Structure formats: C-alpha cells, structure tokens
Amino acid sequence: MRKQYLSAPLPFVGQKRMFAREFIKVLKQYPEDTVFVDLFGGSGLLSHITKCQKPDATVIYNDFDGYRNRLQHIPQTNHLLADLRKMVETEGIPKHSCIRGELRDRIFARLEQEEREGGYIDFITISSGLMFSMKYKLSIPEMKKEALYNNLRKSDYPTCEDYLEGITVVSCDYKEVFARYKDMPNVVYLVDPPYLSTDVGTYN
C-alpha cells in the first residue's frame, strides 16, 4: 500500500505539514473526477496528499522550485550525508555543537569534491544538517559565511519513489499554469503561495 506523507520527505521552507490533516478533511467534499491544480507546488506535499486521498482524480503539481530533482538525487544525498556523519562522529562532535577548525575545512573539501565529481549537491538538505534554524544556503561560498553545527540526522532519508506517483508534474510560472487549466471542467486550484514572513531565498 502506498505510504501517505504528512510532511515533505526532504527539508523545504514553508512546507504545509502544519495543516495537512485539516487539508485532508477539506478534500472529502470534492468528487473523484476533480482536476486539482497545485499552483505553488513547493514540496509537492499537497499534491501528494490529494492523490493519496483521491486516487482517481487528476492532480497537477507545479514544481517550480525543482523539488522533484532533489527527490531523484536522494541516494546521492544520503551517501554524502553518511560521509559527513562519519567525519563528525570520528571527531566526537556532540549533537548541536559547533564545527570548527580543521574538521570544518575537511567538510568543505568533501562538499567541493562532491560538486566537482558528482555534479550535484542538494544544498537545502545538506545545509539543514550543518546549520541552525532553517538557515538554508544554496552554494558552498554562501555556506562558508556561516557557522557550522552538527545537526546531521542519524539515518538516511527514505527514497520515496512513489511520492509523486500518478501526479502530472509541470514547472512553469503560476500564471501560465492557471491559464492552461482555467477552462477545464471540475478544476480546483490549490493556492498557497509563500507567506510574507517566509525567507524566499531558496525559492525560484
């Protein structure tokens, strides 16, 4: 049976986990042949929940921020996190403690190696393990400006291959997505843009 997530499988600023259960209640009022269009898709959580609750419905997820690409790289991200975890544990750095000196330098050297040889780093996930309070950075130079902490999780992220199963994924400006489906019968727009208080630095 397909697993239903009530929070996004990878870190994301402004994910909708706080009202996931209330959202499920609201979905019950819509028929099974509804076309749901998630205009500001973010982590895809609302699209995922909608498809789990309404498996026969059409669900369109506007992945403007490239979350699907992050999901596809989970195995690579887990491998990098495992290396970082081993480095921190070998040095005996306690949880939530600051990472300084030679270990900090070695961590950045490992990140630079990954970027050079692997060609991809999920900076949001990696920085969530090395920084505090959702202080996500999107490049190594930006990370170097910040203090590092041992906030690395002890286990791998689940690969969640079925998270977006059965969902139509697009990546467009929300106005374009709205115009594309506005004349379709039984369409319902899921409209939840980033809050004014949300740090939009990680959004496209």
Where are these regions (language model features)?
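S-adenosyl-L-methionine
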Residues: 1-35, 45, 125, 129
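Short, well-ordered alpha-helical scaffold segments within catalytic/effector domains
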Residues: 16-24, 154, 171, 175
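Short, well-ordered alpha-helical microsegments
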Residues: 20, 43-47, 177-179
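A general structural motif
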Residues: 31-34, 56, 184-186
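Conserved proline-anchored active-site loop of SAM-dependent methyltransferases
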Residues: 37-50, 61-65, 129-131, 183-199
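Conserved S-adenosyl-L-methionine
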Residues: 52-58
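Class I S-adenosyl-L-methionine-dependent methyltransferase module
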Residues: 58-164
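Conserved mid-sequence domains
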Residues: 164-204
